[in-house]
UniProtKB/Swiss-Prot annotation:
Enzyme Commission number: 6.3.5.2
Organism: Methanoregula boonei (strain DSM 21154 / JCM 14090 / 6A8)
Gene name for this UniProt entry: guaAA
A Gene Ontology molecular function term of the record: ATP binding
Metabolic or biological pathway, per its Swiss-Prot or TrEMBL entry: Purine metabolism; GMP biosynthesis; GMP from XMP (L-Gln route): step 1/1
Protein name: GMP synthase [glutamine-hydrolyzing] subunit A
Length: 184
């Protein structure tokens, strides 16, 4: 079975995503965000777009979204997804990293097995203020309306929060769910 690639967008937690997958015995490779799309299409069964400081430093990540491979975007990864498909991203009102209670509105594939409210660790320096057409709002919080989205027919998912950090309760479940999506 092919591995899942974790695309390094220069975020401070990208290596933790890779480690979380390894800890779950999910074969994963951390790759630069300049990796050619042809290489992604032939060598990986899923793509995780990691977080990062700025969309201007996101390399060619937007090109990966047309490959037909399942994608999970985390923080900046969500913003890349939203912009690619016509959503709008703007500076967040809350800024920096911190604990947030997220309300799950829809327990779809990526959020399967979660309770209705979960404490997570998130950054809201930027956030999605309008989701793309064809996407479903999965979760929100008191400080950010768009905490998670999905387009199941494209197998594309995005989270504002960081499931890879220890402050996010049950964060590894997202990766288990994504692994299952990539195995279908």
């Amino acid at each position: 079975m092919l591995p899942i690639c974790v695309v390094n967008n220069y975020g401070q937690f990208n290596h933790l995503i890779h480690r979380a997958l390894r800890d779950l015995d999910i074969d994963a490779v951390l790759i630069p965000n300049t990796t050619p799309r042809e290489e992604i299409a032939s060598q990986y069964r899923g793509i995780i777009l990691g977080g990062g400081p700025d969309i201007a430093r996101a390399g060619v990540c937007a090109e990966y979204l047309d490959l037909g491979i399942p994608v999970l975007g985390i923080c900046l990864g969500l913003h890349i997804i939203a912009r690619k498909f016509g959503g709008v991203v703007h500076p967040g009102k809350s800024g920096g990293y911190g604990s947030v209670e997220v309300t799950i509105r829809e327990h779809d594939d990526i959020l399967s097995g979660y309770p209705d409210i979960i404490p997570v660790w998130a950054s809201h320096a930027d956030e999605v203020c309008r989701i793309p057409e064809g996407f479903t709002l999965l979760a929100s919080s008191g400080i950010c309306e768009v905490e998670a989205v999905a387009c199941p027919r494209k197998r594309i998912y995005g989270l504002q929060w960081h499931p890879e950090v220890s402050h996010t309760v049950g964060g590894k479940r997202v990766y288990e769910n994504f692994d299952a999506i990539c195995t279908e």
